[in-house]
């Protein structure tokens, strides 16, 4: 008998979600069973974990399982588990409300592709609502483990914006979800249909899924039988597991709709015994760049589920990796805090990191096309590697890909090994330029002398690149050198001598330019790096790069004031023209315009763009 029954309205976001789920996934209805079984599996995991420290939660029933029963007469399917169960408050919170941000993300991710969208509901933790794809009414009976039978609850909704909830005595813990099927969905009253769906989506669930046995005539008996493999797949040897099994397990733990690119499954024995199963996804998750987004591996200890998103087993730059760690020697009551300072965890972390990098190296060597797909999805994250993982810096460096002046494309496809193999005779540095965009890098005046001499330059336009080159300053003994900082020395003694001679001849001009620019520059020098442009700005060798300064300023950070060096091309017609200008005001106009032009060409911003436009207009009129 139901007592203290209340009618409540769904949160606005839940109404939206219900509408979206039911109407966007109607042609892929069978996924409701996958989602409800997955939720039941989670409930069993949670109970077993909590029972490690409080055995009374088992209530003398430690035979954990998921049960599915069909009632053709009542047109219902009931999915029940003897897991952790729900209290009144948890039922209202979990079945009546969801995070607003989650709704917005869900809506933005919908594509109209049934296969893809069906996976999103699991990814966003709203799989329960898939029940309304096939049912016009859903009844949930539940009691949280440890509460009294009188604390059982019954929750019911027709998916129309409201739900009722009340207390109802329930002698057993756990949750029982009854779907009252819509008439057009009677196909799901077929025992064989349900078994087929379980085999397709949930065979790898490590808890037994039981249904009533069928006689040879196809009639139900009172006995139950397990209809899935009910094995912790990762505990088996590789030879016992099919490729499709690996893929299905990946989809279960990741809520991904695509197959993984590759995986690595290892049983480690010795001082520490553990199993790892690591997957490299085929595409980036929607929240890859959200700082608060959950990531990490599933942790088991002796086959007992301990926690999701155990971040301690991989560095942050590998946060896209999905998988499982099953350790034999960790304590069952281990907490996230204990994981931080555990020697065995450090050992497993080091091994997992090397395993992932090894998988990537193998892919990059043996299957360049697949590796390029990986890089297009995750390359930006991998570039964080040398910054935070000094021990594996060299291994990560081999995996990096870049755009270059030789590739002629914005696609990042060139490895550092390829670059080094193409270096000119006598070249001892790897040259690069950083900019705010690929086009800004590709068209930088700093490239002029390198193009003339046929020297390849890395074009770096990702924000992380500035930090990357700060931490990775050499590769296989070759120093990485910015072409927009300090002097450029390309081993051309004749040009250097010519510059020295010109410096003597043009000393009065250089002094005059310095007096005009005054505090805006650190120095004015003749350059050998330009062939087509009249001037450029560069950072001093010891100063922060100009692009890094812009990034930090945009982030609102205080940075030390550093002025650029203004370099002029003595062979350019505009610089030669400066010789002939006698009027100081005209000279100042020309010099200021050339300087600001160089700042813009470098990707910088002017304090007063209107002044620049006005100056250019005045010079056009007077020329």
Curated annotation (Swiss-Prot):
Q: What biological function has been recorded for the protein in this entry?
A: Molecular chaperone. Has ATPase activity.
Q: Where is this region: A?
A: 1-336
Q: Tell me the Pfam families matching this sequence.
A: HATPase_c_3, HSP90
Q: Which organism is it from?
A: Legionella pneumophila (strain Lens)
From the Swiss-Prot or TrEMBL record, state where the protein is found: Cytoplasm
- What keywords are annotated for this sequence in UniProt? ATP-binding, Chaperone, Cytoplasm, Nucleotide-binding, Stress response
**GO molecular function: any one?**
ATP-dependent protein folding chaperone
Mind telling me what this protein is named? Answer: Chaperone protein HtpG
Question: According to the UniProt record, where is the region B?
Answer: 337-550
The record's Gene Ontology cellular component field reads: cytoplasm
